[in-house]
Structures are given as structure tokens and as C-alpha cells.
Amino acid sequence: MNYKTVDVILERALLGDDISPQEGVVLLTQTDSGAIASIRATADKLRQQQAGDTVTYVINRNINFTNICEQHCSFCAFRRDDGDADAYWLDWAGIREKSHDAVQRGATEICMQGGLHPQAQIDGKSLPYYLKLVETIKQEYPQIHLHAFSPQEVQFIARVDGLEYVDVISALQNAGVNSLPGTAAEVLDDEVRRILCPEKINTATWLEIIGTAHKVGLHTTSTILSGHIETPEQKIGHLEKLRSLQQTAINHKYPARITEFIVLPFVGQEAPKSLRRRVGRDQPILADALLLGAVARIYLGNWIPNHQPSWVKLGLAGATEALTWGCNDIGGTLMEEHITTMAGAVGGTCMEVATLQNAIASIGRPYQQRDTLYHKVDAAKKLANTVMSNG
């Protein structure tokens, strides 16, 4: 593909136009270093226009409440069967302890997800168990933002209890869930999903659950798991579905929408052998993740202005570099993260705030703490949170 075509696409993007799926594929398949440099520069300029120069971060904690799961996704090294030596399931005291620790350390957000544990029920029902998870945290820490339960978990609860998705989402929201993680998306293409995660929800169900959350006023994030068996066309198809979903939320004036987009590069080190062989490497290729991040900024930025790399997947140096390829946020402190780390990632499981701040400062950009919904967290709010947690 010649420079002229790439330049024309990038010029249109800089004028504020949405690029087409075909144009997205053109950008994503560039191998010429000059063309890639132009894509990076355009993404960086759009990031500046759409999200500003300040790089944000969030103080949060991950709670993966169980690794027992009925599914067998081909990329997952986290799941265990009930009875495995290293299977675990946190009790209520464990949930409270981790929540207390998070708040003491200044967290404004708890991100909670877990395996699909068939025994995670109260009186033979799934939803009451999940509601108790929420209430266990919210009764003690009503001020914490609870970012919890993927579309896959929503579908699991609905299936087990014979409920509609909207009823599950509304019940979780009423109990205190503040936003839904847009995980379990992997690649929104059923051909890929049949190989990667055949037991998981299909593309239409993922889109339906996220769209339903927006309708009832629950914000969500969005993600892509990239760098395994998917094609450039399938990656762009994924971005197109997300853009369309966000356009629907905005055009229909739904009370909530997608707050951010995160590229999650595939980590294969501990993945099952069949997928490792097929992918042919254990760690993400940084250049591929950076290019996808840049194209995602160009493709989605008019509609989803906040873009985040994964320091867990890429390491902090890789994530910092992504801030010059279209990203405006460096994510959270996490405090612990089991799923990616068990897959063999090199990024680690916890970041101190100062470490994130120093990484941002190293590229000459200002930094700012934010909350889950990208509001600035100021000193007064931090103080109020600490007082409430010590009260």
C-alpha cells in the first residue's frame, strides 16, 4: 500500500472523520517504518486533541474471588477445577480483608471478577451469592467504586437462575455495582471465539449485555485480547462493533456508555500447549500492540476518548511507550492481579503510585489521579476517603 493512501486516511482522521473498516485494515497492515511512524504521530496528535496531554491513573485493587471455573478457555492459565490443590475461593472475611486493605491504601476502585464457580450459590441460586459479594464490600465501604462482573459472569448468573440479563444487571446495580468491566470480549468474532473460547458467550450476547448495561445506567469499559490467532480484518471488525455500540449509546442518549478502551496483548507462556504451538511465542510483540493501540485511537477516539495500555501484559516500559502511540491513561495500581500473571506475564501484579507517576513524567507529560469514570480525584476527595476508611 503506498504512502499516498495512508496519508489520505490519516489526513481525514485528523479532520475529525471516522475512518472505515477497510481503511482501518490498511493502517493495521502497514509494515513500512515511515508509514508506521505517520500512524503513530497521527494517533498521538488525536490523543492530544481528544484527551489532552495529562496522563491519568487510578488507585484500585483487583479481587479475583475464585479461580474455580466451569469453562476451559484455551488461553487461560488461571482457571482450576474444584478440588485442585491450588484452587481457591475467598470467604466473606477474605473479601472484607482485601477491601479494607484497598481502602487503607487509598483506593477509589475495587475491580472484582472471578471464575464461573458452579457452587457459588446461596439457597440454590446464583444471583444471591453475587449480591452478597457486592454487599460485603459496600456495607463497610459505600464510597468505593465497585467495578465488577464481566458480561460472561452476567450471562452465567442469568443462565443458572433463569433470569433476563436486564434483571441481573439491575439487581447488581441496586446492590452497589457501579460499573461493568468489558472483559470476556477477547475478539468479537465468532470464528475466533469458537477456537479460543468455545464455551464463552458469543459476540451478539456480549454486545447485548454491554448495551443493556448502558440502557440501565451502568457504565462499562471495553477491551480486546490481541496477538493470537486473529486476523487484521477481525481486529478491525472488533473495533467497528465497539464504535457502533458506543454510537448507539450516545445517539439514543442512554444514561451510560463505554468509558475506556484497553488493548490486552495475549500472553501465552502458561497457556495450554495447543494454543501456544499455534501462536508460536510466549510474550506479546510490543510493536504489534503499539500499532494496534495507535489504530484503535484513530478508529475509536471520536467516540471513546480514553485509551489505556496494560502494564501487566506489556511491562511498565512498554505501557509507557504506548502513551506516545495514542494512549492517555496508564491504568491502575491493581495491588494484585492473578489472571495475567498466572499466564506468565512479566509486568508484575502491583504498582506503587509513585512508580506510575515517574513513568509518566519520564516522557515529559503531566499526571493526574482519576476515578473509574475519569473524574479528577483531588486532595479533598482523597482525604474524605481516608477518613471514612478510618472511621
Curated annotation (Swiss-Prot):
This protein's UniProt keywords: 4Fe-4S, Iron, Iron-sulfur, Metal-binding, S-adenosyl-L-methionine, Transferase
Cofactor note: Binds 1 [4Fe-4S] cluster. The cluster is coordinated with 3 cysteines and an exchangeable S-adenosyl-L-methionine.
EC number: 2.5.1.147
The protein's required cofactors: [4Fe-4S] cluster
Top EC class of this enzyme: transferase
Any coiled-coil regions, as ranges: none
Binding site for [4Fe-4S] cluster: 69, 73, 76
The protein's assembly and partners: Consists of two subunits, CofG and CofH.
Protein name from the UniProt record: 5-amino-6-(D-ribitylamino)uracil--L-tyrosine 4-hydroxyphenyl transferase
Lineage: Bacteria, Bacillati, Cyanobacteriota, Cyanophyceae, Nostocales
